[in-house]
From Swiss-Prot:
Function of the molecule: Involved in the disassembling mechanism of the intact light-harvesting complex of photosystem II (LHCII) in the thylakoid membranes. Required to trigger chlorophyll degradation during natural and dark-induced leaf senescence.
Name recorded for this polypeptide: Protein STAY-GREEN, chloroplastic
Recorded superkingdom: Eukaryota
Lineage of the organism: Eukaryota, Viridiplantae, Streptophyta, Embryophyta, Tracheophyta
GO cellular component, as recorded: chloroplast membrane; chloroplast stroma
KO phenotype (gene knockout): Stay-green phenotype during dark-induced senescence.
A matching Pfam family: Staygreen
Keyword Transit peptide annotated: yes
Tissues expressing the protein: Expressed in leaves, roots and developing seeds.
Gene it is expressed from: SGR
Amino acid sequence: MAAATSTMSLLPPITQQQRWHAADSLVVLASRCHNSRRRRRCRYVVPRARLFGPAIFEASKLKVLFLGVDEEKHQHPGKLPRTYTLTHSDVTARLTLAVSHTINRAQLQGWYNKLQRDEVVAEWKKVQGHMSLHVHCHISGGHVLLDLIAGLRYYIFRKELPVVLKAFVHGDGNLFSRHPELEEATVWVYFHSNLPRFNRVECWGPLRDAGAPPEEDDAVAAAAAEEAAAEQMPAAGEWPRRCPGQCDCCFPPYSLIPWPHQHDVAAADGQPQQ
């Protein structure tokens, strides 16, 4: 997963909320559908984003490892830390998913993985009683080659993320069978980059909808909505915030995957960092 300086936007048919802060060092996008019947995530794709064809999840190509996690007990991630580490092999086209209490760093070793940086890591969080899945992708930084193709990597990651989310749900199927409400949890996607344009946080809506592929008829609407959104200053986006003190409604007490610009988000909302 990783290449043309084309990008895609989360643009709902009615409203889109964005927050630009610190000289465009961080962008928070939040979108919400108002059609309660369909409850689909309102995600549109610009026409040129179809260059590489549709992203399709194939369960037969997914290998799942449970590391330190009892697959049969299905502990709720709101009570016990639960993370996902997903890597992809360009040689075999297979995915490897590790389900653990922390990031499986052994899965990320080796010169090839350090050069490609095509892993996706995620963690479950409970904030003020609401579950959310926080997904992290490395776009650029740490290697000059990654900087040169940052736009392409951003596009590829966004295009493949529905496949990634489906892999999480399928690979951790027993957890979702026991706790189906987790599919309604909000998905937050963090794109890590040393380039302000691609260093951003996006809200992809409920997990159930975030893993759905874009509709074929969305391209034209996307282009118009993207152009209109660029002409006006967006409003502040929503951001999940922990309680200021110790509580039972927030877990875990600290992030297993720190977002290096959390202070920017806190400043943008005028709230102290947690």
